[in-house]
UniProtKB/Swiss-Prot annotation:
The keyword Ribonucleoprotein applies. Keywords: Ribonucleoprotein, Ribosomal protein, RNA-binding, rRNA-binding. It holds the Pfam family Ribosomal_L21p. The lineage of its organism: Bacteria, Pseudomonadati, Pseudomonadota, Gammaproteobacteria, Enterobacterales. This is Large ribosomal subunit protein bL21. GO terms for biological process: translation.
Length: 103
């Protein structure tokens, strides 16, 4: 059984017991979270597709950890003008473990 849901403007395909990295959620580590924006649920041959969301579809998860991703460097450069700017960015994320999928 697997499902597709959206969180943080992105869509994720998950199955029960899987750990997923999402955009930062303001929920403490160890707490439970439910995602109601379920786009699709598949259970063997049976597939439910939402318009836009599956009615009654809920994905339950537990927050495992918070952290920051790898550093991305942004560089602005003008040749022959002695001009160079560098900037770095690290995006916050939340790891969640999927505990249940229900329709």
């Amino acid at each position: 059984m697997y499902a597709v849901f959206q969180s943080g403007g992105k869509q994720h395909r998950v199955s029960e017991g899987q750990t997923v990295r999402l955009e930062k959620l303001d929920i403490a580590t160890g707490e439970a979270v439910e995602f109601a924006e379920v786009l699709m649920i598949a259970n063997g041959e049976e597939i439910k597709i939402g318009v836009p969301f599956v009615e009654g579809g809920v994905i339950k998860a537990e927050v495992v950890a918070h952290g920051r991703g790898e550093k991305v460097k942004i560089v602005k450069f003008r040749r022959r003008k002695h001009y160079r700017k560098q900037q770095g960015h690290r995006q916050w994320f939340t790891d969640v473990k999927i505990t249940g999928i229900s329709a």
